[in-house]
Regions:
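Short, flexible helix-loop junctions that flank or precede catalytic/ligand sites
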Residues: 1-226
Length: 226
């Protein structure tokens, strides 16, 4: 989806490294070059080194799987390339921790510093059943680079504060999973039971619900009148 958005929005060279190629992108405003692991290249790090010689503006790495790939991705980002990728993690905080934990302890401070300087954002997704039974809806957690976000990424003592940073950063487009779930419950898109099961912190999610004064659609609040 991000490659498609870039392709529609602006000219430039987008280079993708995928395993396997799942969607073939036709050139629109951008030129899209797609490479497949196993067919066009033997490994991610080798592919990234070759990619840098093709003058890309945007590089998509199908998945960050090991330290060597993350190191190459950071190097590309530090030289001014926009780098997109994916990981199998549960939320923004785990994403940062996983990126750092690919590396031995003596390298982690440098990696954190590089991430703090280069990581522009994190988008995490979960699919949860709709209240009307008509399929699923995507719940999204978003972290966007600002001073607090960068500090929480770079400082191991503050990474645990990332959920709070996201929750308080709505002005810049940030939100936690639980905040989005709350909005979906209020809109009637997801029921409370499903939302609570999907919440990152079910107890805190319940507190959020009560603080909003939320009541189920069709319910009448008991104000003591008879």
């Amino acid at each position: 989806a991000m490659v498609g958005l870039v392709n529609q929005a602006r000219p430039g060279h987008v280079l993708t490294l995928e395993d396997p190629i799942e969607v073939v992108h036709r050139d629109k405003r951008a030129t899209v070059t797609q490479r497949e692991l196993g067919s066009d290249t033997r490994d991610w790090s080798r592919a990234l080194r070759a990619a840098m010689r093709q003058d890309p503006d945007v590089i998509l790495i199908g998945e960050l799987r090991d330290a060597e790939t993350v190191r190459a991705a950071l190097s590309a980002a530090e030289t001014g390339h926009a780098v997109l990728s994916s990981m199998h993690t549960t939320d923004a905080r785990e994403t940062v921790l996983r990126l750092v934990e690919f590396f031995p302890s003596h390298e982690q401070p440098r990696v954190r510093a590089a991430l703090g300087a280069s990581l522009e954002g994190v988008v995490c997704q979960r699919l949860v059943p709709r209240a009307d039974g008509a399929g699923r809806v995507c719940v999204v957690e978003v972290g966007v680079r600002d001073a607090r976000f960068a500090e929480a990424v770079a400082d191991p003592d503050k990474t645990h504060d990332l959920p709070e940073v996201l929750a308080e950063g709505s002005w810049s487009g940030m939100q936690t999973f639980d905040q989005h779930l709350l909005a979906l419950v209020q809109a009637g898109t997801v029921d409370v039971r499903t939302a609570t099961m999907a919440a990152s912190n079910p107890h805190d999610f319940g507190v959020m619900l009560r603080r909003t004064g939320w009541t189920p659609a069709g319910a009448v609040a008991d104000d003591g009148a008879r």
